[in-house]
Amino acid sequence: VIKHTNMMFYNFSITLKTCDMDLILCDMPIWKHVYHTLHSLDQWYINPEVYTEPDFHEPNLNSLDDYDNQKVLSREMLIDYFETIKEKITEYLNSLCDEDLYEKPDGCEYNRLSLILGQFRHFHCHMGNINATTIYNTNKWPKVLGMYWLDKIDDCEDINDLYE
């Protein structure tokens, strides 16, 4: 779980660097899709019943059904939020043992493994949508590291390695 979460984080760091935040997808700018993806990860990966919104959050800011065009999140804000989530989830995962994955967090109807797998599904779905806009508009394929890279994530840090 830890290695796959780290791979997910690395792949999304590439997405954050390659996407056009102002591009519109389904009537919403990409930055809003990015925030929706990150907000869901932040809320649901650990325990949705014990969750505090980020300081900059406003009602419906994470919604892909509601866009009032009042607040815009910059790439820098989203990267900072992403880094905060990464730290929180990494600390959380390092505190767990395998048996903990089958237990339900306080007040939650799902066990920890279900929450994590649900976020893998949701996160990768949205990351794919965001990456598809980059592919369509630039004719470049953002690098997505797979199983081969599980033990080699640190080998792809150069900006020139952001695309396949």
Residues covered by each model-derived region:
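Amphipathic, well-ordered alpha-helical segments in soluble domains
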Residues: H4, M8-T15, S40, I85-K88, ...
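Short, contiguous alpha-helical
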Residues: S13, K17-S63, D106-E164
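Generic structural concept
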Residues: I2, N6, D27, V34, ...
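Acidic/histidine-rich alpha-helical segments that form the ligand environment
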Residues: D65-E103, L113-H124
